[in-house]
UniProtKB/Swiss-Prot annotation:
It comes from Nitratidesulfovibrio vulgaris (strain ATCC 29579 / DSM 644 / CCUG 34227 / NCIMB 8303 / VKM B-1760 / Hildenborough). Part of the 50S ribosomal subunit. Forms a cluster with proteins L3 and L19. In the 70S ribosome, L14 and L19 interact and together make contacts with the 16S rRNA in bridges B5 and B8. CDD domains: Ribosomal_uL14 (cd00337). Keywords: Ribonucleoprotein, Ribosomal protein, RNA-binding, rRNA-binding. Binds to 23S rRNA. Forms part of two intersubunit bridges in the 70S ribosome. This is Large ribosomal subunit protein uL14.
Length: 122
């Protein structure tokens, strides 16, 4: 469950390390986002000489949340941290590698590029 001002780790090699949610997309008064949702983020920490820099505003898709997500079969999945993958204007990942596991819900949301780059899909 991600809301405005939540901080997330970045799970790709775009150069950003931490981002903060500044808007949950998908409705005028939508409050929370979960795995597979797209949010607007501001880069808070970034490595030097990389694709993104501190202060950049971009879209991101949530790939891991510490709050459990209920699946259709009744099982739950949760992770140790909140993490996102940065997206460009076309909705494609900015980075070329994904770090750590990602949730299976991304496949249902048609983020096939992220699923194929991820080392593990849970």
């Amino acid at each position: 469950m991600i809301q405005v001002e939540s901080t997330l780790q970045v799970a790709d090699n775009s150069g950003a390390k931490k981002v903060a949610c500044i808007k949950v997309l998908g409705g005028s008064h939508r409050r929370y986002a979960t795995v597979g949702d797209i949010i607007m983020v501001s880069v808070k920490e970034a490595m030097p000489h990389c694709k993104v820099k501190k202060g950049d505003v971009m879209q991101a898709v949530i790939v891991r949340t510490a709050k459990e997500v209920r699946r259709a079969d009744g099982s739950y999945i949760k992770f140790d941290s909140n993490a996102a993958v940065l997206l460009n204007k076309q909705g494609e990942p900015v980075g070329t590698r994904i770090f750590g596991p990602v949730a299976r819900e991304l496949r249902a949301r048609n983020f096939m590029k992220i699923v194929s780059l991820a080392p593990e899909v849970l």
